[in-house]
Amino acid sequence: MGGTLAIQSHGDLTLAQKKIVRKTWHQLMRNKTSFVTDLFIRIFAYDPAAQNKFPQMAGMSASQLRSSRQMQAHAIRVSSIMSEYIEELDSDILPELLATLARTHDLNKVGPAHYDLFAKVLMEALQAELGSDFNQKTRDSWAKAFSIVQAVLLVKHG
């Protein structure tokens, strides 16, 4: 059932939208560690309890997080995983990749509310980082792409 949902959702994302997402993601990956670190700092600002899901980073200030090796390593892992998902947006393998992420998140008690917050913060971070390149087409493309990812994660959520 989850695979069917994902495959149907793939059809909703046009080739042009996939190109926009991939192009802007490649722009962001020039500074991947700082982009993803700032993304998590934004998440922790909205939901300080979310920071406690990372015991090695619990209680750190934003400036401490920016220089933390643990945060930098996590940022690299997240950027690599996101890069993989973005490259596989039109692939039937995407649901399997996301199933692994959903299982990991379930173990760490990360669920639908966290996915919603991530979506909100991702859009804010994209706008801040891309500036004028974050136009309506870019916004719509990212929103649709993340909704595909989120739909699969929710289906796979324990």
Curated annotation (Swiss-Prot):
| Protein known as | Globin-1
SUPFAM superfamilies linked to this entry: Globin-like (SSF46458)
Globin domain boundaries: 12-158
Extract the GO molecular function terms from the UniProt entry.
Answer: heme binding; metal ion binding; oxygen binding; oxygen carrier activity
Q: Which family does it belong to?
A: Belongs to the globin family.
Query: Where in this protein does the record say N-acetylglycine is found?
Result: 2
The yes or no answer to whether the keyword tRNA processing is present is no
* Keyword set, alphabetical order: Acetylation, Heme, Iron, Metal-binding, Oxygen transport, Transport
Kindly state the subunit structure of this protein: In the oxy-form exist as a dimer, it disassociates into monomer in the inactive Met-form. Upon deoxygenation it aggregates into tetramer and higher oligomers.
